[in-house]
Amino acid sequence: MKIRNVFFPLLIIGLSWSCSNDDEEIHEPMGDYANGILVSNEGPFSNGTGTVTFISEDLSVVNNGIYKMTNDEDLGNVVQSIGFTENEAFIVANVSNKINVVNRYTFEKIASITDGLNNPRYFIEANGKGYVTNWGDTADETDDFVAIINLQNYTVEGTISVILGPEAILAKDNTVYVAHQGAWGQNNKVSVINTTSNELIKTLTVGDVPNSMQLDASGNLWVLA
């Protein structure tokens, strides 16, 4: 009887300690920049560097230049956009023809992609690969493309030729949609790419200068032009 009275309180204490530890592990922050908003700042055109700002969810903290603060190097000229995978951020520097890959929660650098890009614009993950819109040489309306990024070794493993001015990019299942704003000119198309075959399967005509897209709950594609 005495043994039973001692055993049950100890069992309760052990269970309470175990649950408490589990809760602490679940809520442990993944990094300094896990809970908040990331803002890409282009920086001055043709010189200097772009930056990234972190704003906490409660708006009480604003940290500017977090990439340089963490890695002691500049991002590159004209930070065009930031795209994400589950654990990584892909920071696209347009004029520098570079994508810096970082841990999205700590902002520690993982890799830089510099080969196979030409005026990169926007990144998205689809079907286990990365896709980046590229304007190419803006004086040449025939060299625009979407670069295919190997997410294991962070290299460009292929390209898909597209029409003038690929800009915003959106993914759904095995399909990628590319809005063609027209670079420095004008366009009115959306390219549809199959990410299994990495082939352009269709081109849709929309309003002039499409600049953003959204899928609704029914899977319909909406294009703002």
Language-model segments: residues:
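Bacterial N-terminal signal peptides that target proteins for export
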Residues: 1-7
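Predominantly soluble domains enriched in secretory-pathway, periplasmic, or organellar proteins
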Residues: 5, 20-225
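C-terminal motif of bacterial Sec signal peptides marking the signal peptidase cleavage site
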Residues: 15-18
